[in-house]
UniProtKB/Swiss-Prot annotation:
This is GTP cyclohydrolase 1 type 2 homolog. It comes from the Bacteria. The keyword Metal-binding applies. The lineage of its organism: Bacteria, Thermotogati, Deinococcota, Deinococci, Deinococcales. Coiled coil: none annotated. One of its GO terms (molecular function) is metal ion binding. It comes from Deinococcus radiodurans (strain ATCC 13939 / DSM 20539 / JCM 16871 / CCUG 27074 / LMG 4051 / NBRC 15346 / NCIMB 9279 / VKM B-1422 / R1).
Length: 263
């Protein structure tokens, strides 16, 4: 694990319920048919003075958040995914750790992929300086990704190298399309299912996270390059940007807890 240095500018405080309301409105939590229980998943202290942010909710992450003195852990992947789950075994240990630390757990899954300002896909598009942005990446009738144009055309390997510099991880490249990259679609995490949509929009390349075997041939048959930059590594952007936005709004310091999975 690596822990980013705590931000030092914020010295604020906000009530838990006020922050939860603000997050719900800012992220449009109720706008998506997402079964993953977006919002406050575990209730803790009623005053928020420090935030930790992380991609996943593992026991290690919860322990690190508690040790950091955080009052709220902000995550992309929470503890609940649309089905009843007994509080036993590892799940019990996670819940117990949060409750014993009086730690709030707030999860934002699809709303944080899709958000136009601090979302994973919006932040990646900004980091790549994409222009002429368009909604992209259909998910149950909602566009949660983004498509855009590079400032200048790049070779496929040059573009993959640029992604590697951005994420710090070696990319897997399926070169099924043009060797020259100009129009790019971005869908973080498990977004390989957008290959056909990318082809229909005239995109030459899809940037996503996690490789899936069933989509290997689609890259070549639809004529679209696919760059897999890692599920984890493509989803660090949103929680960091959201935590920074909270600091800007309320003066609450934060730090990022980095537990990369290599996937």
């Amino acid at each position: 694990m690596t822990v980013s240095p705590s931000s030092q500018t914020g010295r604020g405080e906000i009530g838990r319920d006020e922050l939860v309301r603000w997050l719900g409105e800012y992220l449009r939590i109720g706008a998506y048919p997402d079964p993953s229980l977006n919002g406050l998943q575990i209730q803790g202290t009623d005053k928020i003075r420090r935030i930790a942010a992380s991609v996943d909710t593992s026991l290690q992450t919860l322990q690190a958040a508690a040790e950091s003195g955080a009052d709220l852990l902000l995550v992309h992947h929470g503890l609940f995914w649309g089905r009843p789950l007994a509080i036993t075994g590892p799940h019990y240990e996670r819940v117990r750790t949060a409750i014993q630390a009086d730690l709030n757990l707030y999860a934002a899954h699809i709303p944080l992929d899709a958000h136009p300002e601090v979302g994973n896909n919006a932040m990646i598009a900004r980091a790549l300086s994409l222009t002429d942005l368009q909604p992209f990446g259909d998910w149950q009738g909602h566009k949660i990704g983004v498509a855009g144009t590079l400032p200048r055309e790049l070779g496929l390997q040059d573009f993959a190298d640029r992604i590697q510099k951005l994420t710090g991880e070696i990319c897997l490249v399926h070169g099924g399309g043009s060797p020259n990259i100009h129009r790019v679609g971005v869908t973080s995490g498990s977004g390989a299912g957008a290959i056909a949509e990318a082809a229909a929009m005239g995109l030459d390349t899809l940037l996503t996270g996690e490789p899936e075997h069933k989509y290997f041939h689609d890259s070549f048959e639809y004529g679209v390059n696919v760059i897999f930059a890692g599920h984890y590594e493509t989803e660090v952007f949103g929680v960091r940007a959201l935590a920074a936005r909270i600091e800007d709004e309320f003066g609450i310091p934060w730090q990022f807890l980095n537990f990369p999975t290599g996937l």
